[in-house]
């Protein structure tokens, strides 16, 4: 029987500002059984998608994507913030509450035609994941799915990626 993964997510009220409930996945990662269960569920979601590569945005997308890539026997490519990748990159911007931010991916991270699963810890507004998908597709990758530990349903991030197969392990 699968674990109730929500028990491993701490809800911190009024962080980082009043009115926000921060969903902290640190307890899930600190518990080997829960972390394994979450990883296994994403691996099962990915198995029939013939995934060639996992891409995850900085920084917690690495925490989700790397163990999935390992279990599937495929590579992992990090989508990073400005100045963190040493070779030629592609860039995608996304909106923040007050301004914009950007992610970068090495131009050789994805080969044309590769099947890519995009992973992150949390789906909120969908900006980060949309930017990551944009870069994968610009490089010729085929996004076969997206996977998240947590989805904040009230922020409607799912609407931005409705054309992609999606897994969220927990909804708040």
Curated annotation (Swiss-Prot):
Pfam families given for it?
Answer: Pribosyltran
Cellular component terms, GO, for this chain's entry? cytoplasm
- Which UniProt keyword terms apply here? Cytoplasm, Glycosyltransferase, Purine salvage, Transferase
Give EC number(s), comma-separated: 2.4.2.7
| PANTHER family hit by this protein | ADENINE PHOSPHORIBOSYLTRANSFERASE
Q: What is this protein called?
A: Adenine phosphoribosyltransferase
Quaternary structure, from the entry: Homodimer.
Q: What is this protein for, i.e. what is its function?
A: Catalyzes a salvage reaction resulting in the formation of AMP, that is energically less costly than de novo synthesis.
Q: Which organism is it from?
A: Lactiplantibacillus plantarum (strain ATCC BAA-793 / NCIMB 8826 / WCFS1) (Lactobacillus plantarum)
Q: Which reaction does it catalyse?
A: AMP + diphosphate = 5-phospho-alpha-D-ribose 1-diphosphate + adenine
Q: List, alphabetically, the InterPro entries matched.
A: Ade_phspho_trans (IPR005764), PRibTrfase_dom (IPR000836), PRTase-like (IPR029057), UPRTase/APRTase (IPR050054)
Principal location class: cytoplasm
What highest taxon heads this organism's lineage? Bacteria
Q: Which family does it belong to?
A: Belongs to the purine/pyrimidine phosphoribosyltransferase family.
User: What GO molecular function terms would the record report?
Assistant: adenine binding; adenine phosphoribosyltransferase activity; AMP binding
**Listed GO biological process terms:** adenine salvage; AMP salvage; purine ribonucleoside salvage
Biochemical pathway: Purine metabolism; AMP biosynthesis via salvage pathway; AMP from adenine: step 1/1
Q: Does this UniProt record's set of keywords contain Glycosyltransferase? A: yes
